[in-house]
């Protein structure tokens, strides 16, 4: 039984009486015995309640049974393991290699009434774990469970904070450390392997135990894929070969900031003129209210009827052409829902394009003092119709891009055209929404010219979402939901295969006592100058927040930092091209390039921008200096030219001079040195 088949030379399977071990390229993946089984199965009834994208999830667990007995046999492709407990409780595990040589584990409960799986993967106490999509509170996931379910990210996201308590009291919206728009059942271990689960059901990846990782799935089957590499860079190349990679960004992205403006054509023109006349480099105007405004108690929201509102934006079509001639793009907004009181929803309903309720009627979701229909993207005709809405109403208008928002709100009790349970489709929905946008660009020949950016994601978003943004941060300094949280979000996505990430400059969520300060906006601007894209947002209550044109000092700050950003254009373009070619992310954890430095594995608030720039954003209020860690190398402080060799260092960090270092040996060193004179 120990002899591997020719196509499984990287696998080592050893059986001893009623126990076995499975190694893959010298990594222990599974270990099983009667006393320590690797598999449990059971049955449960999901109790999932949604209110405005915030989910209460409970499992009415009926049984959970350890499968202690294992009978092993060889199959044409590898090994077959029949797990059981007694005569009528069993499951089958097929161990093989896929067509690319990856380890493939295919598990099926033999009784389909057993719709729960708990599989334990072997681990070492010293392992670090990264990934699971976009995680805002933790980068190293070891020591905690991470439920995987796409939803709103929460307001506060920390049950110990007052803001979270306030949001929970209002509409169960506070969230917790694991709430995310972009969960994905993919993780990377410091044993230099990745594990990806093909399923899209509700899952919980628990990394709490020292000797194993327990993966729980609310389904009767599971498919897992593993691949190993000698370096993390090579491992990410393999992971993105499986999941897909983002195309390169349009060239105009690197030419300045995208200004988030609302209020109409002339307001956009006036603010654009103000900023450009003061020397601000502007690449675009992003007007999310292009389709109209709906005022709610939450604040100013968009009218979800995806067509140009000529009352609010008169002569927008001709103005877009004018702005384009001046090197300024116009970006809009869309999401996969249609407001029930508008004509696009009526059109979709007439053609049967909306998801259904139990009685066969159109399922209308309450989105916050208004209702909307869910365009059923599993219906090929509805999918094609929505692509045409994008092509006709946005691309033909001349939009250079848009926010493709939402995707997390698919109710689990709706009925879909493809017949698959909405509970299973829920996590898959954001990638389906991304694919709809991607194909609209691909079919019009605009891929690489037009950019859409998303907050929600899942397996497949790596290929189909051209850019991610971090969603709705609070306009505050909190670690779990403020400026700081964007860095672990970007790094965890990087380790999940998506290498293009940015955030709303200044944050978004303006509730309770939170109001964006001038200092926060300027610090966020500093940080964003060292990301792949600079873009502002007014927030949900613009009048409460400090804005980019708040005073002359703020405008001058944007002029300087957009000059910094545009100066880095050739360097950023090269990093983005490498991401498209090999899956090496633009914003990188330090250990990708400093594997032997143990300290780099626990850093979550600093990153490498490309290979040669190290950034440690100031994320605390009132600071004038900052302490950070430099791995051993020849580093130069970007603003003073002072040389550093490595270790913990403290530097002056006034607003406008964030802690940024570059490698003295970089081929781009002369370009980086020029930042000092800006």
Curated annotation (Swiss-Prot):
Induction pattern: Induced during growth with sulfoquinovose.
GO biological process, one term: 6-sulfoquinovose(1-) catabolic process to glycerone phosphate and 3-sulfolactaldehyde
pH note: Optimum pH is 6.
Leading EC class: hydrolase
Binding site for a 6-sulfo-alpha-D-quinovosyldiacylglycerol: 288, 301-302, 304, 537
Entry keyword set: Glycosidase, Hydrolase
Key word Chaperone present: no
Record text on activity regulation: Is inactivated in vitro by the mechanism-based inactivator 5-fluoro-beta-L-idopyranosyl fluoride (5FIdoF) that yields a covalent glycosyl-enzyme complex with the active site nucleophile Asp-405.
Keyword set includes Nucleus: no
Residues forming the catalytic site: 405 (nucleophile), 408, 472 (proton donor)
Biological or metabolic pathway of the protein: Glycolipid metabolism
A Pfam family per the record: Gal_mutarotas_2
GO MF term (any one): hydrolase activity, hydrolyzing O-glycosyl compounds
Resulting phenotype, residue 301 to Q: 13-fold decrease in substrate affinity and 4600-fold decrease in catalytic activity
Origin: domain of life: Bacteria
Catalyses which reaction(s): a 6-sulfo-alpha-D-quinovosyldiacylglycerol + H2O = 6-sulfo-alpha-D-quinovose + a 1,2-diacyl-sn-glycerol; 3-(6-sulfo-alpha-D-quinovosyl)glycerol + H2O = 6-sulfo-alpha-D-quinovose + glycerol
Entry EC no(s): 3.2.1.199
Task performed by this protein: Catalyzes the hydrolysis of sulfoquinovosyl diacylglycerides (SQDG) to sulfoquinovose (SQ), which is then degraded by E.coli through the SQ Embden-Meyerhof-Parnas (SQ-EMP) sulfoglycolysis pathway as a source of carbon and sulfur. Therefore, is likely involved in the utilization of the sulfoquinovose headgroup found in ubiquitous plant sulfolipids. Is also able to hydrolyze simple sulfoquinovosides such as sulfoquinovosyl glycerol (SQGro).
Domain notes: Structural analysis revealed the molecular coevolution of catalytically important amino acid pairs directly involved in substrate recognition, as well as structurally important pairs distal to the active site.
Family per record: Belongs to the glycosyl hydrolase 31 family.
Protein name: Sulfoquinovosidase
Gene field: yihQ
């Amino acid at each position: 039984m120990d002899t591997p088949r020719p196509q499984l030379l990287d696998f080592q399977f050893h059986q001893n009486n009623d126990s076995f071990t499975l190694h893959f390229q010298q990594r222990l993946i599974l270990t099983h015995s009667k006393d320590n089984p690797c598999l449990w199965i059971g049955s449960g009834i999901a109790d999932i309640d949604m209110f405005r994208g915030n989910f209460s999830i409970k499992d009415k667990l009926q049984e959970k049974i350890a499968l202690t007995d294992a009978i092993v046999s060889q199959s044409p492709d590898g090994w077959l393991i029949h797990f059981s407990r007694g005569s009528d409780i069993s499951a089958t595990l097929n161990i093989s290699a896929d067509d690319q040589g990856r380890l493939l584990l295919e598990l099926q409960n033999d009784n389909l009434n057993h719709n729960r799986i708990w599989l334990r993967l072997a681990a070492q106490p010293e392992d670090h774990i990264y990934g699971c999509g976009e995680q805002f509170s933790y980068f190293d996931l070891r020591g905690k469970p991470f439920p995987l379910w796409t939803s709103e990210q929460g307001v506060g996201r920390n049950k110990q904070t007052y803001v979270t308590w306030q949001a929970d009291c209002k509409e169960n919206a506070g969230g917790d450390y694991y709430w995310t728009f972009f969960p994905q059942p993919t993780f990377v271990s410091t044993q230099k392997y990745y594990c990806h689960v093909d399923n899209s059901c509700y899952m919980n990846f628990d990394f709490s135990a020292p000797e194993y990782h327990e993966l729980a799935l609310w389904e009767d089957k599971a498919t897992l894929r593993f691949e190993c590499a000698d370096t993390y860079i090579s491992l990410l190349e393999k992971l993105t070969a499986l999941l897909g990679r983002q195309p390169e960004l349009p060239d105009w992205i690197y030419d300045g900031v995208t200004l988030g403006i609302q209020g109409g054509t002339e307001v956009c023109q006036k603010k654009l003129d103000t900023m450009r006349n003061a020397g601000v480099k502007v690449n675009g105007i992003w007007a999310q209210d292009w389709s109209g405004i709906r005022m709610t108690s939450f604040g100013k929201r968009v009218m979800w009827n995806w067509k140009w509102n000529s009352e609010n934006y008169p002569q927008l079509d001709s103005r877009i052409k004018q702005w384009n001639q001046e090197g300024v793009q116009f970006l809009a907004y869309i999401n996969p829902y249609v407001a029930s009181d508008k004509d696009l929803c009526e059109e979709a309903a007439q053609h049967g394009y909306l998801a259904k309720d139990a009685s066969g009627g159109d399922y209308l979701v309450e989105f916050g003092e208004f209702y909307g229909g869910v365009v059923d993207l599993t219906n090929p005709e509805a999918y094609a119709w929505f692509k045409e809405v994008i092509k006709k109403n946005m691309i033909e208008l001349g939009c250079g891009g848009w926010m493709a928002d939402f995707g997390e709100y698919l109710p689990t009790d709706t009925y879909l055209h493809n017949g698959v349970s909405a509970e299973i489709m829920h996590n898959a929905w954001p990638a389906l929404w991304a694919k709809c946008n991607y194909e609209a660009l691909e079919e019009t020949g605009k891929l690489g010219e037009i950019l859409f950016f998303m907050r929600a994601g899942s397996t497949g978003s790596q290929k189909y979402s051209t850019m991610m943004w971090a969603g709705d941060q609070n306009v505050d300094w909190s670690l779990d939901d403020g400026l700081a949280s964007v860095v672990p979000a970007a790094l965890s996505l990087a380790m999940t295969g998506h290498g293009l990430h940015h955030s709303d400059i200044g944050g978004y969520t303006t509730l309770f006592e939170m109001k964006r300060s001038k200092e926060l906006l300027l610090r966020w601007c500093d940080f964003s100058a060292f990301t792949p894209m600079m873009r502002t947002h007014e927030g949900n209550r613009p009048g409460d927040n400090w804005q980019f044109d708040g005073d002359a000092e703020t405008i001058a700050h944007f002029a300087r930092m957009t000059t910094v950003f545009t100066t880095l254009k050739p360097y950023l373009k090269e990093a983005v091209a490498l991401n498209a070619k090999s899956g090496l992310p633009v914003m990188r954890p330090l250990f990708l390039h400093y594997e032997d430095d143990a300290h780099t594995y626990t850093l979550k608030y600093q990153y490498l921008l490309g290979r040669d720039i190290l950034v440690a954003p100031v994320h605390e209020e009132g600071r004038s200096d900052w302490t950070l860690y430099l791995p051993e190398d020849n580093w130069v402080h970007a603003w003073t030219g002072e040389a550093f060799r490595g270790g913990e260092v403290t530097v002056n960090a006034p607003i406008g001079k964030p802690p940024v270092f570059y490698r003295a040996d970089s081929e781009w060193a002369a370009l980086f040195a020029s930042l000092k004179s800006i």
